[in-house]
């Protein structure tokens, strides 16, 4: 295929790297306190390297853009975060979009909003106008790092606060859709903005603490406290948010979508939410099979994505790859097939948003 843009779709790449790195950490019980402190520092530094380092373009994956969809329009819209950073976003829409609705799309970790152009375009094609932005420390936005797992909720709160204060958006019905890191914020945003009408969360983790339980389990459990302390220090205002508590007290129409074989946001998150919210008539669940961390993709796309991940890990071992070599690498994959969307899942998403 002809490459005319730089596309990225590996949203959870750094989560995967963290999980792999964690398994390489020595798990022998240190013989003395000094060694224990050294190991703990290695773990925290490794975590910082994965989760507190800017997410910029690696030039080894693709990003779709609005230019790849005939008639799709975009308008730049930036806002200031409470941390003082400029967060860059864009309004996406086709002609004759629904004037009284706005859907905010919240991206996952490891890239920016353009990793989700297929999802954004589908929402626009259905008649919605979509606002999508890059989080702190990601792609086009400012910030030295993404500042940990709770930062997505901080940024989404700033985003909605800005939109509500802008007369250009006065009176709009606001909904939110997010994936993974962005689904965590989506799950919790109604606690901060109860007027949000609809949310769709794809593979959202319940809380920062529950996500750490996933990464630092078994022999690694002893390192969890130090990493949680880092997360709390990085974002004390939003660290403790829990999706069960946020949704238990909310009236927002919620659709929570997961895949039973997700190795990043594991089935336990679905189970906790389903049990904790079983009496909430406004909260609905969808559990897919064989979809990994992308339940809105087709099963074939998920398989291709997995094959790409393995190939990319191998390619990453090549030292000092040139731009030409990177271009040839990404040109060897069919990115449309790798990002194919499951129409059945999207039918349920649209039915939910259209209520």
Where do the protein language model's features map onto the residues?
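Hydrolase active-site cap/lid region
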Residues: 188-236
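C-terminal catalytic histidine-bearing segment of alpha/beta-hydrolase fold enzymes
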Residues: 281-355
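Alpha/beta-hydrolase active-site loop
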Residues: 146-167
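Short beta-strand/loop motif that positions the catalytic acidic residue
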Residues: 250, 256-258, 262
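An N-terminal hydrophobic leader/cap segment in hydrolases
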Residues: 26-80, 88-90, 312-326
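Short alpha-helix in the alpha/beta-hydrolase fold that links the catalytic acid
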Residues: 252, 266-276, 300
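The serine-hydrolase catalytic nucleophile loop
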Residues: 109-121, 268
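Conserved alpha/beta-hydrolase
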Residues: 123-142
